[in-house]
A protein has these predicted regions:
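Nucleotide/phosphate-binding catalytic cleft detector across ATP-hydrolyzing
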Residues: 1-91, 110-124, 158-191
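A short mid-domain helix/strand-loop element embedded in enzyme catalytic domains
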Residues: 69-73, 97-102
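Short helix/loop capping segments that flank catalytic or ligand/cofactor-binding pockets
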Residues: 78-79, 102-104
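Short hydrophobic beta-strand that contains or immediately precedes a catalytic carboxylate
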Residues: 93-95
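Glycine-rich phosphate-binding loop plus the immediately following alpha-helix
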Residues: 98, 104-143
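A mobile "lid/hinge" subdomain adjacent to the ATP/sugar-phosphate binding pocket shared
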Residues: 133-173
Length: 191
């Protein structure tokens, strides 16, 4: 994915490049140095351009000089404060992704690291839905990402039948909130 992202900016970005990327707070310290080392270098990317033009195999050279690796939730906070909304004051930032749910208290002076929460994302609820469906349906080789798509749509085709997932989705989201989100937030939000 990183090479695909670099390829997408190759025609429009000035070199040397500066890259900012993020990891979930729970793993960001583990991977920060590795990611920096992997990204900060000259990248030679070969690709087949014939899928969208008449040219064949091409390559681009991209020089990455500066790399910043931050927790994803910090990136969310920066976007809220410096981006379009220009948020002010003290507030909690909640980020619910597929793999990770994160939250942090953001103050004018910065984030409060003791309020940082990093736990299971929506994949937890999707897996609960899969377990529920397996009780009455054969799911075959469907994985969590395919089920996530069905989770979002609210239906899935199983055994040539349209199965409505809205009630199951509502129940597993309620369970996900009660089992994962609420207990974790309760530890940092005491108002």
């Amino acid at each position: 994915l990183v090479k695909a992202a670099l390829l997408l900016v190759s025609d429009s970005a000035e070199q040397p490049l500066t890259i900012t990327t993020g990891f979930p707070y729970s793993t960001y310290r583990i991977y920060k140095d590795m990611a920096t080392e992997f990204l900060r270098k000259t990248h030679i990317i070969e690709f087949d351009a014939s899928t969208y033009s008449n040219s064949g195999k091409r390559s681009v050279i991209l020089d990455v000089q500066n790399v910043e690796v931050i927790p994803e939730i910090v990136g969310c906070t920066i976007a809220l404060r410096k981006g379009e909304h220009q948020a002010e004051g003290n507030f909690f930032v909640l980020s619910c992704g597929f793999g990770t749910f994160e939250s942090v208290l953001s103050m004018e002076s910065g984030i409060v690291e003791q309020t940082m929460v990093s736990t299971h994302g929506l994949k937890y609820a999707v897996n609960m839905m899969m377990s529920e469906l397996e009780k009455s349906h054969y799911l075959g080789f469907r994985n969590a990402h395919l089920m996530d798509e069905a989770f979002q749509k609210g239906y899935i085709i199983l055994n040539r039948k349209n199965v409505d997932l809205r009630e199951i989705r509502r129940n597993v989201l309620r369970s996900y909130y009660n089992e994962v989100i609420s207990p974790n937030l309760r530890n940092v939000i005491t108002d």
